[in-house]
Amino acid sequence: MESADSGRSDPVKGDDPGPSFVSSPPATPSRYESQKRRDWNTFLQYLKNHKPPLALSRCSGAHVIEFLKYLDQFGKTKVHVAACPYFGHQQPPSPCSCPLKQAWGSLDALIGRLRAAYEENGGRPDSNPFAARAVRIYLREVRESQAKARGIPYEKKKRKRPPTVTTVRVDVASSRQSDGDPCNVGAPSVAEAVPP
């Protein structure tokens, strides 16, 4: 005599392997996500090494600017000082002793990644030090000073506007009825359809 559940195995005894899931390897993060994580860890390390050590919750826009200035020592962009004979030259003919700094574009991208990382790690958007007005002003000043020093104007990208569509208004009362064609009633002439 066979029991009703003889085809089933007992999960308590362990002879049922259970549902089989094919585990896929964890998805590799995008280049942006990897860079954002590295930047975030670098900033946290900076706060840890700060004298005195600084908690993230007490971090302000001033600390972010201090961090950006600290990063200048690792920069690779030659920024001429006002007294340099090559100030304002894009392609100086010979080397000079002007400092290397972080390029404005690199700092701007870094702040964007850190702003996102701050909120992803539990920070409130209204207290985000990377979104502080002082940081935006600092970045604008860096952009303008580097543009002058390197002779490279930074211009905002102009948005392409969609082509304008010209509408033609047809006046039915002034349509041609002179040729007697009933199909031509209300149809504009070519001259009427083209705007002046």
From Swiss-Prot:
Record-level GO cellular component terms: nucleus
GO MF, one example: DNA binding
Main location: nucleus
Region annotation Disordered: where it falls in the sequence: 1-36, 149-196
Domain of life: Eukaryota
Motif (Nuclear localization signal): 156-160
Compositional bias ranges of the Basic and acidic residues kind: 1-16
GO terms, biological process: mRNA transcription; post-embryonic plant morphogenesis
Keyword Transcription regulation attached: yes
Pfam short name (any one): ALOG_dom
Places the protein is found: Nucleus
Family: Belongs to the plant homeotic and developmental regulators ALOG protein family.
Primary role: Probable transcription regulator that acts as a developmental regulator by promoting cell growth in response to light.
Protein name: Protein LIGHT-DEPENDENT SHORT HYPOCOTYLS 6
